[in-house]
Amino acid sequence: MLEFCSLYSGSSGNSLLVKTENTNILIDAGVSSKKIETALNSIDIDPSSLDGILITHEHTDHVQGLGTFAKKYDLPVFVNQKTLDAMPKQKEKISEKNINLIKIEEKFEIKDLKIKPFAIPHDAVNPCGFNIFKDNRKISIATD
Protein backbone atom coordinates (compact mmCIF):
# COMPACT_ATOMS: atom_id res chain seq x y z
CA MET A 1 0.00 0.00 0.00
CA LEU A 2 1.19 3.49 -0.91
CA GLU A 3 -1.38 6.24 -0.35
CA PHE A 4 -1.47 9.99 -0.82
CA CYS A 5 -3.80 12.54 0.77
CA SER A 6 -3.86 16.29 0.16
CA LEU A 7 -4.52 17.96 3.51
CA TYR A 8 -4.26 21.53 2.18
CA SER A 9 -3.55 22.86 -1.28
CA GLY A 10 -3.45 26.40 -2.60
CA SER A 11 -1.95 29.82 -2.05
CA SER A 12 -3.16 29.88 1.56
CA GLY A 13 -1.18 26.75 2.45
CA ASN A 14 0.02 23.33 1.33
CA SER A 15 0.44 20.09 3.20
CA LEU A 16 0.30 16.51 1.93
CA LEU A 17 0.41 13.10 3.57
CA VAL A 18 2.02 10.00 2.09
CA LYS A 19 1.49 6.77 3.98
CA THR A 20 2.10 3.05 3.89
CA GLU A 21 1.21 0.33 6.36
CA ASN A 22 4.27 1.29 8.43
CA THR A 23 5.15 4.88 7.54
CA ASN A 24 3.51 8.31 7.59
CA ILE A 25 5.29 11.32 6.13
CA LEU A 26 4.15 14.89 5.70
CA ILE A 27 5.24 16.91 2.70
CA ASP A 28 5.28 20.61 3.54
CA ALA A 29 3.62 22.28 6.51
CA GLY A 30 2.18 25.43 4.97
CA VAL A 31 -0.64 26.03 7.43
CA SER A 32 -0.65 26.41 11.21
CA SER A 33 0.35 23.53 13.42
CA LYS A 34 -3.21 23.39 14.76
CA LYS A 35 -4.68 23.09 11.25
CA ILE A 36 -2.26 20.28 10.40
CA GLU A 37 -3.23 18.44 13.59
CA THR A 38 -6.94 18.86 12.84
CA ALA A 39 -6.54 17.65 9.25
CA LEU A 40 -4.53 14.60 10.30
CA ASN A 41 -6.98 13.73 13.07
CA SER A 42 -9.86 13.99 10.58
CA ILE A 43 -8.34 11.09 8.61
CA ASP A 44 -7.45 9.11 11.74
CA ILE A 45 -3.74 9.86 11.69
CA ASP A 46 -2.18 10.67 15.05
CA PRO A 47 0.34 13.49 14.45
CA SER A 48 2.78 11.76 16.80
CA SER A 49 2.81 8.78 14.39
CA LEU A 50 4.51 10.81 11.66
CA ASP A 51 7.97 9.63 10.66
CA GLY A 52 9.13 12.92 9.18
CA ILE A 53 8.39 16.08 7.24
CA LEU A 54 9.78 16.69 3.75
CA ILE A 55 10.09 20.31 2.60
CA THR A 56 9.83 21.31 -1.06
CA HIS A 57 10.82 24.98 -0.68
CA GLU A 58 10.85 27.88 1.76
CA HIS A 59 7.76 29.88 0.76
CA THR A 60 5.39 30.59 3.63
CA ASP A 61 2.53 28.65 2.05
CA HIS A 62 4.75 25.55 2.38
CA VAL A 63 6.43 26.10 5.77
CA GLN A 64 4.18 28.33 7.90
CA GLY A 65 3.55 25.69 10.59
CA LEU A 66 6.78 23.73 10.17
CA GLY A 67 8.81 24.89 13.16
CA THR A 68 6.00 24.72 15.68
CA PHE A 69 4.70 21.36 14.44
CA ALA A 70 8.14 19.73 14.19
CA LYS A 71 9.07 20.98 17.66
CA LYS A 72 5.81 19.88 19.29
CA TYR A 73 6.06 16.33 17.94
CA ASP A 74 9.89 16.09 17.89
CA LEU A 75 9.82 15.21 14.18
CA PRO A 76 12.70 14.84 11.77
CA VAL A 77 12.69 17.37 8.94
CA PHE A 78 14.19 16.52 5.54
CA VAL A 79 15.30 19.62 3.65
CA ASN A 80 18.14 20.80 1.45
CA GLN A 81 20.69 23.23 2.88
CA LYS A 82 19.76 26.26 0.75
CA THR A 83 16.08 25.92 1.60
CA LEU A 84 16.86 25.50 5.29
CA ASP A 85 19.02 28.64 5.27
CA ALA A 86 16.24 30.59 3.51
CA MET A 87 13.77 29.99 6.36
CA PRO A 88 15.58 31.14 9.53
CA LYS A 89 12.42 31.62 11.62
CA GLN A 90 11.40 28.02 11.05
CA LYS A 91 14.95 26.68 11.37
CA GLU A 92 15.42 28.12 14.86
CA LYS A 93 12.40 26.17 16.17
CA ILE A 94 13.60 22.78 14.88
CA SER A 95 15.92 20.75 17.08
CA GLU A 96 19.31 20.41 15.42
CA LYS A 97 19.16 16.61 15.87
CA ASN A 98 15.98 16.59 13.75
CA ILE A 99 17.44 18.40 10.74
CA ASN A 100 18.25 15.93 7.98
CA LEU A 101 19.97 17.54 5.02
CA ILE A 102 19.09 16.10 1.63
CA LYS A 103 20.49 16.69 -1.84
CA ILE A 104 18.77 16.84 -5.20
CA GLU A 105 18.99 13.47 -7.02
CA GLU A 106 20.38 11.65 -3.93
CA LYS A 107 18.10 8.91 -2.62
CA PHE A 108 17.37 8.50 1.07
CA GLU A 109 15.05 6.29 3.07
CA ILE A 110 12.42 6.79 5.72
CA LYS A 111 11.47 3.35 7.03
CA ASP A 112 9.91 1.43 4.10
CA LEU A 113 10.00 4.40 1.69
CA LYS A 114 12.78 5.25 -0.74
CA ILE A 115 12.75 8.93 -1.65
CA LYS A 116 14.57 10.74 -4.44
CA PRO A 117 14.37 14.55 -4.55
CA PHE A 118 14.41 16.20 -7.97
CA ALA A 119 14.83 19.82 -9.07
CA ILE A 120 11.77 21.80 -10.11
CA PRO A 121 11.58 25.27 -11.68
CA HIS A 122 10.17 27.83 -9.26
CA ASP A 123 11.10 31.21 -7.79
CA ALA A 124 12.64 29.75 -4.62
CA VAL A 125 16.28 29.18 -3.65
CA ASN A 126 16.48 25.42 -4.35
CA PRO A 127 12.98 23.98 -4.83
CA CYS A 128 12.47 20.28 -5.22
CA GLY A 129 9.87 17.64 -5.77
CA PHE A 130 10.00 14.08 -4.54
CA ASN A 131 9.74 10.68 -6.17
CA ILE A 132 8.60 8.31 -3.44
CA PHE A 133 8.92 4.56 -3.93
CA LYS A 134 7.60 1.53 -2.09
CA ASP A 135 8.06 -1.88 -3.65
CA ASN A 136 6.79 -1.53 -7.24
CA ARG A 137 4.77 1.63 -6.60
CA LYS A 138 5.74 5.27 -7.05
CA ILE A 139 4.25 8.65 -6.19
CA SER A 140 5.74 11.86 -7.56
CA ILE A 141 5.13 15.15 -5.79
CA ALA A 142 5.83 18.47 -7.53
CA THR A 143 4.32 21.59 -5.98
CA ASP A 144 3.58 25.08 -7.33
PLM regions and their residue ranges:
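Metallo-beta-lactamase
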Residues: Q81-N136
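A generic structural signal for short beta-strands and their flanking turns/coil linkers
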Residues: N14, T23, S49-D51, Y73, ...
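Conserved beta-strand hairpin/beta-sheet module of binuclear metal-dependent hydrolase folds
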Residues: M1-I43, C128-D144
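Structured catalytic core of nucleotide-sugar glycosyltransferases
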Residues: C5-S15, T56-Q64, V77, P88, ...
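Ser/Thr-centric signal marking residues that sit
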Residues: T56, T83, T143
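Active-site metal-binding motif and surrounding structural segment of the metallo-beta-lactamase
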Residues: S33-N80
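A generic "binding-loop/recognition-motif" signal
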Residues: S12, S32, H59, T83, ...
